[in-house]
Structures are given as C-alpha cells and as structure tokens.
C-alpha cells in the first residue's frame, strides 16, 4: 500500500448534482425547480413562520407574563450554608458580610436543605417550616 494508491471505499463517495447541464443529465433546463413560481426564482422563498399572508401563529396567540422586577432583590439560602456564618445572631447584613448573598438583596428566605450543626438565632429573616424546625432542634431560634 502506498499513499498514491489510496482510494475511498467503493460507493462511499457520490458526485455532486450538476444542475442545468443539458437534457441528458436529468437535471437540465429548470434544474429540478419545476416551472415558474416563487420557489423557482433565485432567492425566492418565504421567511420562517410566514403563512401566506394569514396572521401567523406566533402573532395569533396572546402574550402573557413578565419578569418581576422585585424578584431581583430576593434570595434564598440553604440551611447548611448557615454553618459558615461565625455569629450567634444572623441578620441580612451578617449574610452579606460573609458573602452568602449579594449586597443588593433586600429579603432572604432560609430553606431546609442540608443540616445545621450549630445554634443560630435568625433575626428579620424568613424561613420555611422545615428549616424552622431544624434550627430550633439544633438549639437556635427564629425571631
């Protein structure tokens, strides 16, 4: 075997369609585009979603909802993340100081995910029922 004798396997390569090259090719004259009409023209085709002038589906259906602006300032924190806070009383500012929430956050809710190993006192922070039980079980309190 030599590099100059290498060839692709038989039938693995096919010649490209040569359009408009005479009647004998089977793709002469109209080049497989039929006679006249929009699709026979160069650059002629409708845009995606066009329904022939009928009001398209994406415009017939109603719009709904919007992104809430206040959602940007609300955060949730997991129970096990409170273990990283080295303070007895956990407030919004404490969480910001320890980098658990962004500086622009205005309300926080603690959710019951993971375990809490130490007693902490939450002040001005909302929490789920499961998180409250876990905090009180660890010897902490929710104010």
Curated annotation (Swiss-Prot):
Protein's recorded name: Large ribosomal subunit protein uL15
Matching Gene3D superfamilies: 3.100.10.10
UniProt-listed InterPro entries: Ribosomal_uL15, Ribosomal_uL15/eL18, Ribosomal_uL15/eL18_sf, Ribosomal_uL15_bac-type, Ribosomal_uL15_CS
Transmembrane segments: none
NCBIfam families (alphabetical): rplO_bact
PROSITE patterns in UniProt: RIBOSOMAL_L15
Family that this chain belongs to: Belongs to the universal ribosomal protein uL15 family.
PANTHER family from the UniProt entry: 50S RIBOSOMAL PROTEIN L15, LARGE RIBOSOMAL SUBUNIT PROTEIN UL15M
Subunit and partners: Part of the 50S ribosomal subunit.
GO cellular component: cytosolic large ribosomal subunit
Gene Ontology MF, one: structural constituent of ribosome
HAMAP family: Ribosomal_uL15 (MF_01341)
Transcription in keyword set: no
Organism listed in the record: Francisella tularensis subsp. holarctica (strain LVS)
GO biological process per UniProt: translation
Keywords noted in UniProt: Ribonucleoprotein, Ribosomal protein, RNA-binding, rRNA-binding
Gene field: rplO
Domain of life assignment: Bacteria
Region (Disordered) location: 1-52
Role played: Binds to the 23S rRNA.
